[in-house]
């Protein structure tokens, strides 16, 4: 009878099993700094692999997108349904300097706004800011009952919807194209544009829950370190040298 190998028998130990290394020992924590328009500047921390050989940690961090609740950035729970996207543009020491990258609503908030017996009106506008950021803004609005209205439904006619959408587009275009990205962010936080639309469309049909529900960054200009440092309240270059108060003394060598 031929004798073959028994596969069920365990093989002899050729070498000891390698000890699993904790991947976190090769990583470092970096702080994330929010730009000027927001009240809270320290957003949180992010992990990245340490610089080894040709792999630079700074290159891995640049371009990283961070999503933060506006409630955390403003210390106000009324903004909890809005999410802000921040993009890491520069790394200074152990800090990641970010810039505004976009805005969005939470899905539960959007679903809670849609109800029966009313008309939903949406508009989107592509605008260029004065500092050459190309953005697309998405607006949302809902019709509401007029004062002393008995009728249950608040449906707007097609002509009214078109007129409201035209007015929404005009206001967004005017407000966004006449300011920088930082100024636009300052307008988006207190919802200035939404209130402006609500006021301007009162004569066509009363509106409620008017919001800029989403902001999408389509194109950005060439990276400017000076502008980013100004946004974070720092100076990239010290143009004026520090005055030296030290008294000059001529050194006299003693003759040997």
Curated annotation (Swiss-Prot):
Residues 1-20 are annotated as: Disordered. Keywords: Acetylation, Cytoplasm, Ribonucleoprotein, Ribosomal protein. One of its GO terms (molecular function) is structural constituent of ribosome. The keyword DNA repair does not apply. GO terms for cellular component: cytosolic small ribosomal subunit. One of its GO terms (biological process) is translation. It is found in: Cytoplasm. InterPro entries: Ribosomal_eS1, Ribosomal_eS1_CS, Ribosomal_eS1_euk. Its main location: cytoplasm. It comes from the Eukaryota. The modification N-acetylalanine is found at residue 2. Transmembrane segments: none annotated. Residues 1-18 have a biased composition (Basic residues). Belongs to the eukaryotic ribosomal protein eS1 family. Component of the small ribosomal subunit. Mature ribosomes consist of a small (40S) and a large (60S) subunit. The 40S subunit contains about 33 different proteins and 1 molecule of RNA (18S). The 60S subunit contains about 49 different proteins and 3 molecules of RNA (25S, 5.8S and 5S). This is Small ribosomal subunit protein eS1. It comes from Chaetomium globosum (strain ATCC 6205 / CBS 148.51 / DSM 1962 / NBRC 6347 / NRRL 1970) (Soil fungus). The gene is RPS1.
